[in-house]
Amino acid sequence: MTIAAGSQDDKQRRAALWLLACLGVLAIQVLVQHLMGRLWICECGYIKLWEGVVKSSGNSQHLSDWYTPSHVIHGFLFYGLGHLLMRGKPWSARLLLATVIESAWEIAENTPMVINRYRAATISLDYFGDSILNSAMDTLAMAVGFLIASRLPVAATVAIAIVLELFTGYMVRDNLTLNVLMLVWPLDAVKAWQAGV
C-alpha cells in the first residue's frame, strides 16, 4: 500500500466517523422529542409523502410540506457558515456542525414556548408542533441542502434559494424569510397578507 492510498483510506474512515456522528445527533434529536411527548407520526394515523395544505392539522406532520424548502435553504446557509468557521476541515465535519444546529432548532421549535410564539405571531394558528417523523425529515432536508451547496457554485446556490423563497412565498404566502420575520418581529400587515385579507 502506498502512502497516498493509506492517506485516502484515513480520509474515508474519518468521513465515515463524522457521518456516523451526524446520525447520532439525529438519533438524539428523535429521542429528546420523544421524551418531550411529541407524536411519532400525524395524529391522523397515516403517513403522507407530501402535505400540501398549510392551514391544516396535517401540516408539519408528514414526510414533506411547504416548509421543506426552508430546511433545504438552512442547509445552504449552514454550508456557508461551516465554510467560514471550519476552513480546512472536511465537508463531513462541517455537516456535523450543520446537523447540530438544525437538530437544536428542531428541538427548540417543538417546545411549548416556541409553538405558542408561532401561534400568537404568525398565521400558524393550527400549529401544534412537528411530528417526530416530520422533524427528522426536516433535518434530512437540511442535509440535502448542505450537500447541494457543497457541489454547486455559490451563485447557483443563491439562485436556487431565491427561487425557492419566491415560489413558496407565491404559493402559500410563507417562506423562510417571512417565517423568521414574523417569529422575531411580527408585522400586522404581513400577517394580514398571509391570511389572505
From Swiss-Prot:
One of its GO terms (cellular component) is plasma membrane. It is a multi-pass membrane protein. The chain crosses the membrane at residues 16-36, 152-172. It comes from the Bacteria. It is found in: Cell membrane. The keyword Membrane applies. Keywords: Cell membrane, Membrane, Transmembrane, Transmembrane helix. Disulfide bonds: none annotated. Belongs to the UPF0314 family. This is UPF0314 protein R03235. The lineage of its organism: Bacteria, Pseudomonadati, Pseudomonadota, Alphaproteobacteria, Hyphomicrobiales.
